[in-house]
A protein has these predicted regions:
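FMN-binding flavodoxin-like domain, especially the glycine-rich phosphate-binding loop
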Residues: 2-10, 15-38, 43, 48-130
Length: 130
Protein backbone atom coordinates (compact mmCIF):
# COMPACT_ATOMS: atom_id res chain seq x y z
CA UNK A 1 0.00 0.00 0.00
CA UNK A 2 3.02 2.31 0.24
CA UNK A 3 2.64 3.52 -3.36
CA UNK A 4 -1.00 4.40 -2.74
CA UNK A 5 -1.06 7.98 -1.59
CA UNK A 6 -4.59 9.08 -2.51
CA UNK A 7 -7.81 7.06 -2.30
CA UNK A 8 -11.21 8.12 -3.62
CA UNK A 9 -14.36 6.73 -1.99
CA UNK A 10 -17.69 7.45 -3.69
CA UNK A 11 -20.96 6.41 -2.04
CA UNK A 12 -24.62 6.99 -2.86
CA UNK A 13 -25.35 9.26 0.08
CA UNK A 14 -27.23 6.83 2.30
CA UNK A 15 -26.38 7.06 6.00
CA UNK A 16 -25.27 3.42 6.30
CA UNK A 17 -22.88 3.66 3.36
CA UNK A 18 -21.54 6.99 4.55
CA UNK A 19 -20.73 5.23 7.83
CA UNK A 20 -18.96 2.41 5.95
CA UNK A 21 -17.01 5.01 3.94
CA UNK A 22 -15.87 6.77 7.12
CA UNK A 23 -14.83 3.45 8.67
CA UNK A 24 -12.98 2.55 5.47
CA UNK A 25 -11.03 5.80 5.78
CA UNK A 26 -9.79 4.74 9.23
CA UNK A 27 -8.19 1.65 7.66
CA UNK A 28 -6.21 3.78 5.18
CA UNK A 29 -4.14 5.87 7.57
CA UNK A 30 -1.10 5.90 5.26
CA UNK A 31 -3.05 7.60 2.47
CA UNK A 32 -5.13 10.69 1.92
CA UNK A 33 -8.74 9.54 1.60
CA UNK A 34 -11.30 11.69 -0.18
CA UNK A 35 -14.94 10.72 0.45
CA UNK A 36 -17.55 11.94 -2.01
CA UNK A 37 -21.29 11.58 -2.03
CA UNK A 38 -22.18 10.61 -5.61
CA UNK A 39 -24.02 13.91 -6.13
CA UNK A 40 -20.79 15.80 -5.34
CA UNK A 41 -18.55 13.64 -7.57
CA UNK A 42 -16.82 15.30 -10.53
CA UNK A 43 -14.65 13.75 -13.23
CA UNK A 44 -11.58 15.57 -11.90
CA UNK A 45 -11.83 13.51 -8.68
CA UNK A 46 -10.67 10.35 -10.50
CA UNK A 47 -7.29 11.07 -12.06
CA UNK A 48 -5.31 12.05 -8.92
CA UNK A 49 -6.45 8.89 -7.08
CA UNK A 50 -4.29 5.78 -6.82
CA UNK A 51 -7.16 3.54 -5.63
CA UNK A 52 -10.95 3.61 -5.50
CA UNK A 53 -13.89 2.36 -3.47
CA UNK A 54 -17.44 2.68 -4.82
CA UNK A 55 -20.56 1.85 -2.82
CA UNK A 56 -24.31 1.98 -3.27
CA UNK A 57 -27.22 0.62 -1.26
CA UNK A 58 -29.26 -0.34 -4.34
CA UNK A 59 -28.60 -0.57 -8.09
CA UNK A 60 -28.46 2.55 -10.24
CA UNK A 61 -28.81 5.33 -7.68
CA UNK A 62 -29.52 8.73 -9.24
CA UNK A 63 -26.47 10.12 -7.44
CA UNK A 64 -24.19 7.85 -9.53
CA UNK A 65 -25.21 9.26 -12.94
CA UNK A 66 -22.01 11.29 -13.39
CA UNK A 67 -19.79 8.52 -12.00
CA UNK A 68 -21.32 6.04 -14.47
CA UNK A 69 -20.82 8.43 -17.38
CA UNK A 70 -17.18 9.13 -16.55
CA UNK A 71 -16.21 5.51 -15.86
CA UNK A 72 -17.45 4.51 -19.34
CA UNK A 73 -14.88 6.74 -21.01
CA UNK A 74 -11.73 6.54 -18.90
CA UNK A 75 -8.89 4.05 -18.54
CA UNK A 76 -7.60 3.88 -14.98
CA UNK A 77 -4.82 1.44 -15.87
CA UNK A 78 -5.24 -1.34 -13.34
CA UNK A 79 -5.58 0.82 -10.23
CA UNK A 80 -7.09 -1.06 -7.25
CA UNK A 81 -10.83 -0.83 -6.72
CA UNK A 82 -13.18 -2.15 -4.05
CA UNK A 83 -16.96 -2.29 -4.26
CA UNK A 84 -19.28 -2.15 -1.26
CA UNK A 85 -23.03 -2.40 -0.83
CA UNK A 86 -25.76 -3.19 1.66
CA UNK A 87 -27.75 -5.34 -0.72
CA UNK A 88 -26.88 -8.56 -2.44
CA UNK A 89 -26.38 -9.60 -6.00
CA UNK A 90 -28.24 -6.86 -7.92
CA UNK A 91 -26.14 -4.09 -6.41
CA UNK A 92 -22.94 -6.09 -6.86
CA UNK A 93 -23.72 -6.70 -10.54
CA UNK A 94 -24.54 -3.02 -11.01
CA UNK A 95 -21.28 -1.87 -9.40
CA UNK A 96 -19.24 -4.34 -11.46
CA UNK A 97 -20.98 -3.15 -14.63
CA UNK A 98 -20.08 0.50 -14.09
CA UNK A 99 -16.37 -0.18 -13.50
CA UNK A 100 -15.79 -2.79 -16.23
CA UNK A 101 -14.80 -0.31 -18.98
CA UNK A 102 -12.37 1.64 -16.76
CA UNK A 103 -9.74 -1.16 -16.64
CA UNK A 104 -9.61 -1.14 -12.83
CA UNK A 105 -8.16 -4.01 -10.76
CA UNK A 106 -11.43 -4.81 -8.98
CA UNK A 107 -11.34 -6.92 -5.83
CA UNK A 108 -13.65 -9.85 -6.65
CA UNK A 109 -14.75 -10.00 -3.00
CA UNK A 110 -17.34 -7.27 -2.60
CA UNK A 111 -18.08 -5.95 0.91
CA UNK A 112 -21.81 -6.66 1.33
CA UNK A 113 -22.82 -5.33 4.74
CA UNK A 114 -23.28 -2.23 6.82
CA UNK A 115 -21.04 -3.93 9.39
CA UNK A 116 -17.51 -2.59 9.58
CA UNK A 117 -16.08 -5.49 11.61
CA UNK A 118 -14.20 -7.22 8.77
CA UNK A 119 -13.58 -4.07 6.77
CA UNK A 120 -9.86 -3.78 7.56
CA UNK A 121 -8.86 -7.08 5.96
CA UNK A 122 -11.01 -6.38 2.90
CA UNK A 123 -9.50 -2.90 2.46
CA UNK A 124 -5.97 -4.34 2.70
CA UNK A 125 -6.76 -7.08 0.17
CA UNK A 126 -8.20 -4.52 -2.23
CA UNK A 127 -5.25 -2.15 -1.98
CA UNK A 128 -2.76 -4.99 -2.37
CA UNK A 129 -4.50 -6.08 -5.57
CA UNK A 130 -5.75 -9.46 -4.34
Amino acid sequence: MSSIKRILVVHDGTADLERVAEALKKHCSDASVIIRNGVDFTATDLLPADAFFFGCSSPKPASFAELERVLKGINLAGKPCGLFTLEGEKSVLYLRSIVKDADLAVNFATHISSSVKKLGAWVSETLEGR
